[in-house]
């Protein structure tokens, strides 16, 4: 079967490494934390992220990035968006042949407003680029790793890469569709994190189902507006990489973005909430990026604007809700 390196030892990278191993592939994980590497090699666990799960014993781990980079020609990039450019640049300096990069990050770069596939493309030389794709959709790691039925989308500018992703990951509990709209799938995965934080705030404040439904619906509308302006197919946002990912992230306590929002809605400061969670919350960085990107593109994104004021200007959550509800009359 196929050899694959998984860069990143977070919850989703670990869950997908387990899928790949169970599908018969040879998997090497890379991470910087020596304790996590040792724990995985010795005990087949990653307790920090997937506390009670015993992983496939065939998964190995290393902290040596050169070993990881030269293990195979296929990489699963399971890193936070803010770490992607640095790690892919380092990988590029260590390899001498084409590699296929599959990423699962859901974010937008702060300074450049680039999607993750664009960041990877920037970071590697042309003669090392064997194709770049994304695997995205409603897929909590905690459910994937215990084989709960899950359905996701694989996308790339190169259809061969989309089909490769489908072939590598698909099994009887993980169904993978291909989708040729890379822009839409990446934007859907990133932008829904903004709405998920807002959804958590609404829940934390004690508002009911009406408010939650309105937030998700109007959130999808502003995601679609920006996506279409950036070249995405609006129909993509009605699929797994759009509304599918939006629903699961806006309604589940598995979601870091929702959990952060919930804590903010209950009155915690962002520092207090993040200290309790001790995990990367992509929605914070994405809100910052998209707030400025929307202004640059002249796209109306009222929920994003309101959340930006909460996260970065210390606007009270009650005032932000009042501002949203008090906007001028308009047609849907």
Curated annotation (Swiss-Prot):
Keywords: Cytoplasm, Lipid biosynthesis, Lipid metabolism, NAD, NADP, Nucleotide-binding, Oxidoreductase, Phospholipid biosynthesis, Phospholipid metabolism. The active site is at 192 (proton acceptor). NADPH binds at residues 11-12, 32, 106, 141, 256, 280, 282. It is found in: Cytoplasm. Its EC number is 1.1.1.94. It holds the Pfam family NAD_Gly3P_dh_C. PROSITE patterns: NAD_G3PDH (PS00957). It comes from the Bacteria. One of its GO terms (molecular function) is glycerol-3-phosphate dehydrogenase [NAD(P)+] activity. Gene3D superfamilies: N-(1-d-carboxylethyl)-l-norvaline Dehydrogenase, domain 2, NAD(P)-binding Rossmann-like Domain. GO terms for biological process: carbohydrate metabolic process; glycerol-3-phosphate biosynthetic process; glycerol-3-phosphate catabolic process; glycerophospholipid metabolic process; phospholipid biosynthetic process. It is an enzyme of class 1 (oxidoreductase). Pathway: Membrane lipid metabolism; glycerophospholipid metabolism. InterPro entries: 6-PGluconate_DH-like_C_sf, 6PGD_dom2, G3P_DH_NAD-dep, G3P_DH_NAD-dep_C, G3P_DH_NAD-dep_N, NAD(P)-bd_dom_sf. One of its GO terms (cellular component) is cytosol. It catalyses: sn-glycerol 3-phosphate + NAD(+) = dihydroxyacetone phosphate + NADH + H(+); sn-glycerol 3-phosphate + NADP(+) = dihydroxyacetone phosphate + NADPH + H(+). Sn-glycerol 3-phosphate binds at residues 106, 137, 139, 192, 245, 255-257. Catalyzes the reduction of the glycolytic intermediate dihydroxyacetone phosphate (DHAP) to sn-glycerol 3-phosphate (G3P), the key precursor for phospholipid synthesis. Belongs to the NAD-dependent glycerol-3-phosphate dehydrogenase family. This is Glycerol-3-phosphate dehydrogenase [NAD(P)+]. It comes from Staphylococcus haemolyticus (strain JCSC1435).
């Amino acid at each position: 079967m196929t050899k694959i390196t998984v860069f990143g030892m977070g919850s989703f990278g670990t869950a997908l490494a387990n899928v790949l191993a169970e599908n018969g592939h040879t998997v090497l994980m890379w991470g910087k934390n020596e304790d996590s590497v040792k724990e995985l090699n010795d005990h087949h666990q990653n307790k920090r992220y997937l506390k009670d799960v015993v992983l496939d014993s065939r998964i190995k781990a290393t902290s040596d990035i050169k070993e990881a980079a030269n293990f195979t020609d296929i990489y699963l990039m399971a890193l936070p968006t803010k770490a992607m450019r640095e790690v892919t640049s380092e990988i590029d300096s260590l390899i001498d042949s084409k590699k296929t990069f599959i990423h699962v990050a859901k974010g937008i770069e702060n300074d450049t407003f680039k999607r993750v596939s664009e960041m990877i493309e920037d970071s590697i030389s042309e003669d090392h680029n064997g194709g770049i794709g994304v695997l995205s959709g409603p897929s909590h790691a905690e459910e994937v790793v215990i084989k709960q039925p899950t359905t996701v989308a694989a996308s790339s500018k190169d259809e061969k890469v989309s089909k490769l992703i489908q072939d590598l990951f698909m099994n009887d509990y993980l169904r993978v569709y291909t989708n040729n709209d890379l822009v839409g799938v990446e934007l859907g995965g990133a932008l829904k994190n903004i709405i998920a934080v807002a959804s958590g705030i609404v829940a934390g404040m004690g508002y009911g189902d009406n408010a939650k439904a309105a937030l998700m619906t109007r959130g999808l509308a502003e995601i679609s507006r920006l996506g279409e302006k950036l070249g995405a197919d609006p129909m993509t946002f009605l699929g797994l990489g759009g509304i599918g990912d939006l629903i699961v992230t806006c309604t589940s306590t598995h979601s870091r973005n929702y959990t952060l929002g919930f804590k903010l809605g209950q009155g915690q400061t962002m520092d207090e909430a993040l200290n309790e969670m001790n995990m990367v919350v992509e929605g914070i960085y994405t809100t910052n990026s998209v707030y400025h990107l929307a202004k640059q593109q002249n796209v109306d994104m009222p929920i994003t604007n309101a959340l930006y004021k909460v996260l970065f200007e210390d606007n009270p959550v009650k005032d932000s809700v009042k501002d949203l509800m008090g906007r001028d009359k308009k047609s849907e």
